[in-house]
Every structure is written in C-alpha cells, then in structure tokens.
Amino acid sequence: MAKRDYYEVLGVNLNATEAEVKKAFRRLAMKYHPDRNPGDKDAEVKFKEAREAYEVLCDSRKRASYDQFGHAGVEQTFGGAGAGGFGFGDLGDIFGDIFGDIFGGARGGQAREQRGADLAYELVLSLEEAVHGLSRTIKVPTWINCKTCNGSGAKGSSPATCPRCNGSGQMRMQHGFLQVQQTCSVCRGRGQVIKDPCTDCHGQGRQQQTKTLSVKIPPGIDTGDRIRLAGEGEAGLFGAPPGDLYVQVRVKPHPLFHREGNDLHSEVPIDFTTAALGGEMEIPTLDGSVRLTIPPETQGGKQFRLRGKGVKALRSGAVGDLICHIVVETPVKLSPEQKDYLKQFAELLKKDEKNHSPRTRNWFDSVKDFFTSK
C-alpha cells in the first residue's frame, strides 16, 4: 500500500511553519495515541503514520529532501520500514518533544536547542527577469550569531551545568496517571546557565543585523514560486542552528504580455483595412521582434501562435508559445470626408452583402427567424 503524503497526513499545506506542523501533530497524537486507545489497531496505525510525518516535516534537512524527492528522499532515514520504525513513547515524552517550553523540550533527558526562526522575503521581479533568470542582491533584517561570544551568550567563560535539572533541561512531574516533563524554570530548558553574560548580546548569543545575500533566480520562475536558502534565517538562541530564509517571488504585470503557464499572451491591434486586405507587422517578443503575416479577411479574435516564443519551463525545460490575439480597431475621430468615403464603401458592400459580410448576414437572418417563430 502506497504511503500517504506527509502534508496530507497532518492536514497542513506545503508552506506550513514548524509551529503549524507541531500543532497538527499534537492534535492527532491526542486523538490516536495507544495509551488513549488500548487495543485499537487502526488508531495505532494512524498514530505511527502521524509521527513519521511529524519527524520528517519538523526536520529542515529531511523536509527539504522530501519536498524534492518525495518518500524516496527519506526512505533511508526510516530503513524502509515505514511508520513501524517508531516507538510510541508516553504522552509526556511526545509533548516534551513537540512543545518545548510547555512540556520540556527534548527526548532522552537532553536539553533541546531553540532553532532560529524561518524568515520570509518577498522578491518583486519584472516579467523579463522572471523569464530569463538573474542574480539579485537582497538585504534582510535578521538575527546573527554574536561575534564577541561566538553565539554562546557567555563572554570569556563557558556556560555551566544547571544545578536545578543537572543539565537535562527538564523536570519530570507526575500528574495522575500521566508523567510529563516540564521545562526547568532556572535554565529554561537549555541545561546550562550563564554566570557571566556577554555584554554585547546580553547573554542571548545573537544580535540584530541586516544581512546582504545574493539570490540566484532560475529562468522560468513565476509568481508564487519559493526559493529556500537553508541556514539564512534567524540565528538560534545560544548558538542553536539558524532557521531558513524563504524568498517568495511576485512578478509585476507587464504592459504587453500576460503569462499563463509557459505560454505568453499578447493583444495585437490592427486597423480594419489590414484586417480586410492583409499585411505584415513587427511583433515584439521577450527575445526581440518577429514579423507576423496577417492574411486577408482576418477577423477580430483570431489567434496566431508563435511557437517557442514563450517561457522555458522551470523544471522540464520545455518552451511555451507566444499567442497573439488580434483586435480589429474601429477608426475614431473621422473627418467629414472620411465618413463620406466610408458611406460609399458601405453602399458597395450592400450590393453583395452575403459574400462580403456572411456572419453579419447570417446573424440578421437568425434574428429574423427568432422573432418570426414567436
């Protein structure tokens, strides 16, 4: 039986934050944990499935591999055994693993590092930049490791083991039949205390700074696409690993083209004489101009497809087309002389209207039949 998508298992979207993933798993763990459903095999399977999904989506490296390769990208992590590779643990251990400050942080009696927060940055591009790709320098306000104490929070000394929890970061408490772990109130889950805080970062191990980064934009990117820069988010507290930076792309509207997938669309206005008699015209594309032949008797709404003049697909490399939508423009602000010529021309057309304006004639015939049948 094929494995379900991890995001589907937890009921979160692809952009879910770590906090949202934890919240979703907590809800499922409370519902399906075997301690709450003794003897229920279906609940046991669902709990294992949820825990496996949580273990992957809350680990930035595993999640990146899963997002790129699917289950195959993390199979080695679980030895191909699926969710069966996980133990249940008691509810206290689970909550301690998920909810840090509430239930104590890490498993196995070790303090859990507080990873830095992920950051989001909106990058606005022109259509040309999105289609052709480029490198763009961005400036991101963030937290970086303190250079004075190298992120430890202690200047000129090392942090000491917490005397309250003996370095575990947690205090185990008994609540009825449940045994839960609570964060140590002295070290706040770190397992260490700082006796001589760094004066530059006030013992946090990090400082605020605007970071300058170069972002490589691949050709074919579009609005809604996201670029992940691993480790470029906020620095963690007390030397903990940094978060990631997600660059969210938004492409500005273009005066000539609008994009649909890998195809570009453009309205091409022509005068009514060119529509009737035909002609040639220069058509702009994102790679220069091309000549388009307008055949005689071209009607408004006619589409011409210029193959290979669209966008190169971001992943497959296939190239879309440029689709030109013909708009026949009615002349305006005519002089009296021009109006006279048009009236004479109209009279000439009426002599053989069925041949010159078949759609108009057919439309009037249909209208006549419609009212006659009433």
Swiss-Prot record:
**Cofactor (UniProt):** Zn(2+)
Binding residue positions for Zn(2+) 1 = 146, 149, 198, 201
Q: Spell out the GO cellular component terms annotated for this protein, sorted alphabetically and separated by semicolons.
A: cytoplasm
What CDD domains is this protein classified in?
DnaJ, DnaJ_C, DnaJ_zf
Give GO terms for biological process: chaperone cofactor-dependent protein refolding; DNA replication; protein refolding; response to heat
Q: Does the keyword ATP-binding apply?
A: no
SUPFAM superfamilies found in the cross-reference section: Chaperone J-domain, DnaJ/Hsp40 cysteine-rich domain, HSP40/DnaJ peptide-binding domain
- Pfam families registered for this protein in UniProt: DnaJ (PF00226), DnaJ_C (PF01556), DnaJ_CXXCXGXG (PF00684)
Q: Cite the GO molecular-function annotations of the record.
A: ATP binding; heat shock protein binding; unfolded protein binding; zinc ion binding
Q: Which UniProt keywords apply?
A: Chaperone, Cytoplasm, DNA replication, Metal-binding, Repeat, Stress response, Zinc, Zinc-finger
The J domain is annotated at: 5-70
| Cofactor binding, note field | Binds 2 Zn(2+) ions per monomer.
Binding positions (Zn(2+) 2): 162, 165, 184, 187
Record localization: Cytoplasm
In this chain the CXXCXGXG motif repeats are located at 146-153, 162-169, 184-191, 198-205
Subunit structure of this chain's protein: Homodimer.
Question: How does the entry describe the domains?
Answer: The J domain is necessary and sufficient to stimulate DnaK ATPase activity. Zinc center 1 plays an important role in the autonomous, DnaK-independent chaperone activity of DnaJ. Zinc center 2 is essential for interaction with DnaK and for DnaJ activity.
Q: What does this protein do?
A: Participates actively in the response to hyperosmotic and heat shock by preventing the aggregation of stress-denatured proteins and by disaggregating proteins, also in an autonomous, DnaK-independent fashion. Unfolded proteins bind initially to DnaJ; upon interaction with the DnaJ-bound protein, DnaK hydrolyzes its bound ATP, resulting in the formation of a stable complex. GrpE releases ADP from DnaK; ATP binding to DnaK triggers the release of the substrate protein, thus completing the reaction cycle.
Q: Which NCBIfam families match?
A: DnaJ_bact (TIGR02349), PRK10767.1 (NF008035)
**What family is this?**
Belongs to the DnaJ family.
Please give the HAMAP family that the UniProt record associates with this protein: DnaJ (MF_01152)
Identify this protein by name.
Answer: Chaperone protein DnaJ
**Annotated organism of origin:** Coxiella burnetii (strain RSA 493 / Nine Mile phase I)
Q: Which gene is the coding source of this polypeptide chain?
A: dnaJ
